[in-house]
Curated annotation (Swiss-Prot):
One of its GO terms (molecular function) is DNA binding. This is DNA-directed RNA polymerase subunit beta. It comes from Ureaplasma parvum serovar 3 (strain ATCC 27815 / 27 / NCTC 11736). It catalyses: RNA(n) + a ribonucleoside 5'-triphosphate = RNA(n+1) + diphosphate. GO terms for cellular component: DNA-directed RNA polymerase complex. Its EC number is 2.7.7.6. Keywords: DNA-directed RNA polymerase, Nucleotidyltransferase, Transcription, Transferase. PANTHER family: DNA-DIRECTED RNA POLYMERASE I SUBUNIT 2. Pfam families: RNA_pol_Rpb2_1, RNA_pol_Rpb2_2, RNA_pol_Rpb2_3, RNA_pol_Rpb2_45, RNA_pol_Rpb2_6, RNA_pol_Rpb2_7. GO terms for biological process: DNA-templated transcription. Transmembrane segments: none annotated. DNA-dependent RNA polymerase catalyzes the transcription of DNA into RNA using the four ribonucleoside triphosphates as substrates.
Length: 1434
């Protein structure tokens, strides 16, 4: 052993120890890899579900008689457990009950839903929501599914140079300039921008019809919300762009009453108001006329009319005073009556505000009927309609993520960096925090952020609105912060006002302050204040997880339920149309209702309305069911192996509803971005059309409460790396200097380098340690969990690493899996978090273990029972089996792995086997990536896997009678029924082949009229063929195997199975196949080195090493240089060295008398076997009197291992070489020296001998241990042939594909090949009777049956089509017959069809005669055999 170790011995579990060659040591415990699914659904059930359901309540009837209030929510436990749902094809779901209270506001009577007699539950049954299993999946109709996370553009504000608004019919309207997009989660996209070569600021929004995008000045919108021109100029400090915007729009006192097309409505109301005011002599008549006029027409105009009347009255009042004081100077009069003039000005501003709101509402086509406040017509106005459109969360929602983005963009602290301030920044005590003329640096920004959070900076102001503007003022709606900065840092001669949001706003709706701050941002861009957004930056994207998708779906269902309840309440209230109607008799229906209610008894009144009668929950149930069955983001979980399942749950898709199409060629969307660092893996993505649209989360990444992907970093203070860590979003990354994890640290974790490489604002540079804010946790945090399982990935080309990541997910679990000798240290974490391993829930001691279950007594003295999954079929038809890895009396801790799942060994991921591989050619059999394997891999089941097929049959009730499960089916041979029991169901353990019956079933035929004597004969001989037909479940081609289990599910089961009404019974038969590796199967390493098995060579013919060890696999050495995946060569040598050291250690441990426990931790073998092995090796050492390992002959050790059922596959030290931080060249040289491998003379290569001749090959060859996988692409699933089968209705050519029993396509190039060889007759057959010559193939079929010669003389359908197309071009097509006659093609085709039809009738008659003859033979045979009892039948 070396004294100076360049590795540490890391105990993964009690049975697994790995040499860890990582240079960067970290105790960071990453998040649970399933957290993205489990925590999201937990949030939905605990918070979101109740929020969404309660959001529509309380509901009141139009006349205010009834109120329906929400009182609570109950989530019950599922009625069936997970395994029962899986077996019966049911959904694992939790019932939801809501408690509602209906109050009669007239009588005070309160009603609640009565207890359900069937379920015994209080409240209304709302529906059932599928419950997430512990491993993050849903069982839907017996099948495990999961929800893929969707990456979408985050709501918020974006500053762009170009933008577009989508219109109907795939049209777009493009804009260029300085653009601020306000992008809501729900609502209309709105752009604020300065057009090119212009200075005014405009707003663009799509109208409700979607046909056009409407443009208007930003000041028009601000005025519509209640700001005056003076207030706007005050907020923006008289900025040029604002002045120009005010000048362009016509909403000013001098324009508002002019007789123009724009002001037509105001001019008319003004004229009418003036006339009414002049006509009336008395105050009372004036008020009455005014009220009548205001109530006429649209209720939305009532406020505008009222304001104009107020203006007319105020104007008359001023005119009257002027007339009385006509001798007084104007200036003096105005000064003395300033209040009157101010009141008139305020009224004019209110008229302008309401007119602006009216114009925007009409321009955008805002639907005023759906606005809640308009139900009470007294409050109706265009200003309220506009406010409801933009400030109501149900109509315009920017979400918590949008609010976060607004703050990140519009806060002053985010916009002052590298700007010189023109005012002092002072705190609440008037102390100067930052003096004016200071250039704002990173340190100043941190100070501003801190003081802003504490509300300690004196720069917050409030927007002053007109008194009629907002119904209820919310302080956060109106608060903003502002400061003046110099336009030019050097000249410092002009200033501009930066207006930002007030910090701490939590509203998820748009606010007036948002619009003001956005306007400021637009004109500030002229002076390089603020920055343009990169739309592909990950900070501008977020994930929609399961809770958000479900929340949106349930919100839709609750909106429909709300509509239904409102209709029912309106009817019960006697106001179904919200208006008092008159009936046929001319009597007011309000009076009718009172008469009817007086006639009703008290009992009838109580029954008139109830909670159940006004709610219909079917919408909830159907939408939830539809979501889990047909939503684009719900997918079958990939259960090929633990890594596949885990990767599936951490996958991100840019496709889905509202997402990107896979046909979109945009490379910017698909490309890797610098902001993906530590958040999205740059390697793992599919090949093909979906490349870049399907991504995977990085190893340590999480998702925060707003849906943004966050990555962890250690905090650095004064050049010292702290134990604390922090999760940052992609935008927060840009604000900090973040160093790589590879920097040199001393024992106190102080950075030793004078300059370190670090990232800041998207670029990399050199920084001093004191400038660094954070440091990466570990290098592997850049890549996904699949990529982090590939050793030496840094030595592989990116494309090959991508293939390696994807192919690991396709690895088939083997019957005896081995963890890789050369691993990366992530194997345990992947297996543990995959959900396929058995994990202890509590600390405790194991009390009982067998193959079916583990019982642990926990520290609370309670028993935890863990049932193990045994030979369950996965979604990919692989075998899901769990085995215990603990023993009785063993102490276990919470979260410890106590049972292995498929593709696991001792708690570690074990996708394949460690195989002795040589890179050499061998007689051309490994040409073009083909793989040559040894027969040992077949005989010793090294790459043997188990596959389970499920075959299901339903016994139904039909209109002709019930189907029957029976052994007695008509026209089925005894051979096909040989494995059926008395009930007609196959026996467990039977080896079945194609055509064998698994479940016998008969279906009643329709009523067929039969003669009495025929019925008598059927009764006598038990011939059921006339009354029932065979509809049995049979083994299909390629599905042979051994019957592993049979499950019968009846509707009358004690378990309470619920089957559809027309189903009597469901029977499921599980057939197991044991597939050995064979020619045509696909294999791969972990570095994208894939190939097809081309030849299985006998062990004695395989090339062998100097000690006689034969190779297991031969790979082509030409597959390495051009692919640039050198990682496989490093793995090869490191693996071989580790195996050789393992052989030495096996003997050395016994020589040093270290005890058998060392075998358990080093090699991970069973305790009993370890004891016996240690004893046998010790006896061998004693017998040989060996002093060191080289004194023992390895053949003797091989015999000892063989006797204990072991091999050298079980012996070998395990290596951990993490990605980007693993074993380097010196480490590999060191371990190879330790293994006594000669690297100076032969560079680690070996002399290889030909197994056939015994002669050494020319040159040295790279030989070593490589981890090889058997992939899911097996030849048994792909090989296919057909003689006859289905044909396409349209083309009459054979269907394609194995699933449809289709034919092989003989394409254009294949035709060329036959032409080249002159194989005319073969070509004729393929293009005619084997394709679409209908009559020809019928004749050929008949000729084959009769034993006649096959003559193909028909006309293919495709040729007929060709002639028709030529005729369509105006060409005359004729046929020259044998007797030299020229016949028109149409006539010739008609004659051919007539002749062929005649031949077909002859063939049909002959075939029917044969069938009848054969039936008579069967009948005679049955009669002569006397298979009946005389007494019983006669």
């Amino acid at each position: 052993m070396q004294n100076n170790k360049n590795y540490t011995e890391k105990f993964i579990t009690d049975k697994v120890m790995r040499r860890d060659y990582s240079k960067i040591k970290s105790n960071f415990e990453g998040p649970n890899l399933l957290e993205i699914q489990v925590e999201s659904f937990k949030r939905f059930m605990e918070k979101d579900l109740k929020e969404v359901i309660s959001s529509i309540f309380p509901l009141k009837s139009p006349q205010g008689k009834y109120t329906l209030a929400f009182k609570g929510l109950k989530i019950k436990q599922p009625t069936k457990d997970e395994s029962a749902c899986r077996d019966e094809g049911k959904t694992f779901e939790t019932p939801i009950y809501i408690d509602l209270e209906l109050t009669d506001n007239y009588t005070g009577e309160v009603k609640r839903a009565q207890r359900n007699t069937k379920t015994g539950e209080d409240g209304i049954y709302l529906g059932a929501i599928p419950k997430m299993t512990e491993k993050g999946t849903f069982v839907i109709n017996g099948i495990e599914k999961f929800v893929i996370s969707q990456i979408v553009r985050s709501p918020g504000i974006y500053v762009l140079g170009k933008s577009s608004i989508k219109l109907n019919g795939s049209r777009k309207r493009l804009f260029e300039g300085k653009i601020c997009e306000i992008y809501p989660s729900k609502g209309t996209l709105m752009l604020g921008y300065i057009p090119k070569d212009r200075h005014n600021i405009q707003i663009v929004a799509r109208d409700s019809s979607g046909d056009n995008a409407q443009t208007f000045s930003v000041t028009t919108l601000l005025k519509a919300f209640g700001l005056t021109s003076a207030e706007i100029l005050k907020i923006f400090n008289n900025e040029k762009e604002i002045r120009e915007s005010l000048e362009i729009e016509k909403y000013a006192p001098e324009y508002i009453f002019e007789n123009s097309q724009e002001n037509e409505i105001i001019f008319k109301i003004y004229s009418d108001a003036h006339d009414i005011h002049e006509k009336a002599d008395r105050r009372e008549s004036n008020n009455k006329l005014k009220e009548e006029y205001i109530e006429q027409g649209s209720p939305l105009l009532s406020k505008l009319k009222q304001l104009i009347f107020n203006y007319v009255e105020k104007n008359d009042e001023i005119d009257a005073l002027l007339h009385e004081n006509k001798d007084v100077e104007d200036a003096s009069f105005i000064k003395n009556n300033k209040k009157l003039y101010d009141e008139r000005e305020e009224i004019i501003n209110c008229i302008i505000s309401e007119k602006a709101a009216k114009d925007i509402v009409e321009l955008l086509g805002i639907n005023i009927k759906n606005i809640e406040t308009l139900r009470h017509l007294g409050k109706a106005s265009y200003q309220i309609a506009l406010q409801q459109h933009f400030f109501n969360k149900r109509l315009y929602d920017i979400s918590s993520a949008g609010r976060y983005k607004f703050e990140k963009k519009l806060l002053l602290s985010e916009r002052l960096y590298q700007k010189v301030i023109a005012n002092d920044i002072i705190d609440k005590k008037n102390n100067i925090l930052i003096p004016k003329d200071t250039l704002i640096t990173k340190e100043h920004i941190e100070l501003i952020k801190k003081e802003s959070r504490d509300k300690n900076i004196k720069w917050t102001k409030k927007i002053n609105l007109l008194p009629t503007a907002l119904e209820s003022e919310i302080e956060q709606f109106l608060e903003y912060e502002s400061i003046a900065v110099y336009k030019d840092n050097d000249l410092r001669d002009e200033t501009t006002e930066i207006v930002g949001l007030a910090s701490g706003c939590k509203l998820q709706t748009l606010t007036v302050a948002d619009l003001v701050a956005t306007t400021s941002y637009i004109y500030n861009l002229n002076y390089e204040i603020g920055e343009f957004d990169d739309i592909d930056h990950l900070g501008n994207k977020r994930l929609k997880l399961i809770h958000e998708l479900l929340r949106a779906r349930i919100a839709t269902s609750m909106a429909r339920i709300e509509k239904f309840i409102n209709e029912k309440l309106a009817i019960s209230d006697g106001s179904s149309n919200n208006i008092t109607n008159v009936n046929d008799k001319g009597i007011d229906t309000e009076l009718d209702r009172e008469i009817e209610e007086s006639d009703m008894s008290d009992e009838e009144k109580k029954k008139a309305i109830s909670v159940k009668s006004i709610i219909n929950t079917k919408q909830f149930q159907s939408l939830v069911k539809d979501f889990f069955n047909s939503h684009q983001l719900i997918q079958f979980i990939d259960q090929q192996n633990p890594l596949a399942e885990l990767t599936n749950k951490r996958r991100i898709s840019a496709m889905g509803p509202g997402g990107i199409s896979r046909e979109d060629p945009n490379l910017d969307i698909r490309d890797v971005h610098h902001s993906h660092y530590s958040r999205i893996c740059p390697i793992e993505t599919p090949e093909g059309m979906n490349i870049g649209l399907i991504m995977s989360l990085a190893s340590l990444a999480k998702v925060d409460e707003n849906g943004f992907i966050v990555a962890p970093y250690y905090v650095v203070e004064d050049g010292v790396v702290k134990e604390d860590y922090k999760y940052l979003t992609a935008h927060e990354d840009d604000n900090y200097i973040i160093a790589e994890s590879s920097v040199q640290l001393d024992e106190n974790k102080r950075i030793l380098d004078e300059q370190v490489v670090a990232r800041y604002r998207g670029s990399t540079g050199l920084f001093s340690p004191n400038e660094v804010d954070f440091i990466d946790i570990v290098p592997k945090q850049v890549v996904s969990i699949a990529a982090s399982a590939i050793p030496f990935i840094e030595n592989d080309d990116g494309a090959r690493a991508l293939m390696g990541s994807n192919m690991q997910r396709q690895a088939t679990p083997l019957i005896k899996p081995y963890a890789p000798i050369v691993g990366t240290g992530t194997e345990f974490k992947i297996a543990h978090d995959s959900g396929m391993a058995v994990v202890a829930k509590n600390d405790g001691v194991v009390e009982f273990v067998d193959s079916q279950k583990i019982i642990i007594r926990n520290d609370n003295d309670k028993l935890d029972d863990y049932k193990l999954i045994k030979y369950r079929k996965s979604n990919q038809d692989t075998c899901n089996n769990q085995i215990p890895i603990v023993k009785v009396g063993q102490r276990v801790h919470k979260s410890e792995t106590i049972g292995d799942g498929p593709a696991m060994q001792n708690g570690e991921l074990a996708l394949g086997r460690n195989i002795l591989v040589g890179y050499t050619t061998w007689r051309g059999y490994n040409f073009e990536d083909a793989i040559i394997i040894s027969e040992r891999l077949v005989d010793q089941d090294v790459f043997t896997s188990i596959h389970i097929d499920e075959h299901t049959i339903q016994c139904m009730k039909t209109k002709n009678g019930d189907e029957e499960i029976t052994r007695d089916m008509p026209n089925v041979s005894d051979t096909a029924k040989r494995f059926l029991d008395n009930q007609g169901i196959v026996l467990v353990g039977a080896e079945v082949h194609e055509g064998d019956v698994l479940v016998g079933k008969t279906t009643p035929r329709g009523n067929v009229e039969t003669a009495p004597e025929d019925r008598l004969l059927q009764t006598i001989f038990g011939d059921k063929s006339k009354t029932v037909k065979d509809s049995s479940l049979k083994v299909k081609h390629g599905q042979e195997g051994i019957v592993a289990a049979v499950k019968r599910i009846k509707s009358s089961d004690e378990n309470g199975s619920e089957l559809p009404d027309d189903v009597i019974e469901i029977i499921k038969v599980y057939i197991v196949q044991k597939r050995k590796i064979q020619v045509g199967d696909k294999m791969a390493g972990r570095h994208g080195n894939k190939g097809i098995v081309s030849k299985v060579v006998p062990i004695q013919d395989m090339p062998f090493l100097k000690d006689g060890t034969p190779l297991d696999i031969m790979l082509n050495p030409l597959g390495v240089p051009s692919r640039m995946n050198i990682g496989q060569i490093l793995e090869l040598h490191l693996g071989y060295a580790a195996a050789e050291i393992g052989k030495k250690q096996l003997i050395q441990i016994a020589i040093d008398q270290l005890g058998y426990e060392k075998y358990i931790s080093l090699f991970g073998i069973n305790e009993i076997i370890a004891k016996k092995l240690y004893e046998n090796i010790s006896n061998l050492i004693k017998h040989k009197q060996a002093k060191q390992a080289k004194d023992i002959d390895l053949i003797d050790v091989t015999i000892i291992l063989k006797e204990l059922g072991l091999s050298y596959d079980d012996i070998g030290i395990k290596i951990s070489t993490p990605v980007f931080d693993g074993a380097n060249h010196d480490d590999i040289v060191s371990i190879m020296n330790e293994a006594n491998i000669d690297i100076e003379n032969n560079k680690g290569k070996q002399v290889l001998y030909d197994g056939r001749t015994g002669e050494p090959f020319d040159g040295l060859i790279s030989v070593g241990l490589t981890y090889m996988l058997k992939l899911d692409h097996m030849v048994d699933d792909k090989i296919h042939s057909r003689s006859v089968g289905p044909y396409s209705k349209i083309t009459q050519q054979p269907l394609g594909g194995k699933s449809q029993n289709g034919g092989q396509r003989f394409g254009e190039m294949e035709v060329w090949a036959l032409e080249a060889y002159g194989a005319a007759y073969n070509l004729l057959e393929i293009l005619t009777i084997k394709s679409d010559d209908v009559q020809g193939r019928n004749q050929a079929y008949n000729a084959i049956i009769k034993g006649h010669d096959v003559v193909a003389d028909g006309m293919p359908e495709s040729f007929k089509l060709l002639t028709k197309q030529m005729q369509g071009l105006g060409l005359c097509i004729t046929v020259e017959t044998k007797d030299d006659r020229m016949v028109d093609i149409n006539e010739y085709t008609l004659n051919q069809n007539r002749l062929n039809n005649d031949d077909d009738e002859v063939i049909l008659d002959e075939n029917l005669k044969e069938i009848n003859d054969s039936n008579e033979e069967i009948f005679n045979t049955n009669f002569n055999n006397n298979d009946y009892d005389d007494e019983e039948n006669f």
